[in-house]
Every structure is written in C-alpha cells, then in structure tokens.
Amino acid sequence: MSTPKAPTGHFTLLYFASATSFTRKQHDFFAAPLLLAKLYNAIEEKYPGMRAKVLESSALTVNLDYVDVDEEVQKGDKGLVIQAGDEVAIIPPVSSG
C-alpha cells in the first residue's frame, strides 16, 4: 500500500507497529518546515501520552536516514529542519526470538 502524497507545505509522518496501534493510523501530515527538535511536541499535542508510551523507545528516520533525536534537541534552533515533501517515520523497537 502506498502512502498518499503530502499536501503542499507538509511532510509525511509514517507510523509502524505500536505507533500505528496508538494513533490508529498509518500516516499523518504535518506542516513544514518544522524543527525536528519540535516534532515530538507536535505529535504529543495531537496524541496525548504517545511520547511516554511510544516515542521515547522508538527510533526516527528522515528520508530513510536514522536521526539521533536527543542530539537534535540539544542543537535547538540549529538542528535538522524537516522540509515540505520529506518522509519521516517512527520505528518502534523490533524484537526477535
């Protein structure tokens, strides 16, 4: 299944596994540009409780590249900016056995 193209001026946020269960969606669109350091606040505003239950234990990719969210938060206004048309994904922990 393909993800619909983000509307003009927005980026796509993809959800997988527990993130999909929490949001009951496979994707969302958020207005761009947005500092990556502010992304978790934007998600938490839309889905209260998601930071503690999903985001704090998940990885994040921007255009298929893994990003260190803590490092980006420390950079503040000089950190990575998510641009219109970008694809961001929340990757919850994967277990194997």
Language-model features and meaning:
Residues 1-96:
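Ubiquitin-like/PB1-type beta-grasp interaction modules and other compact soluble beta-rich domains
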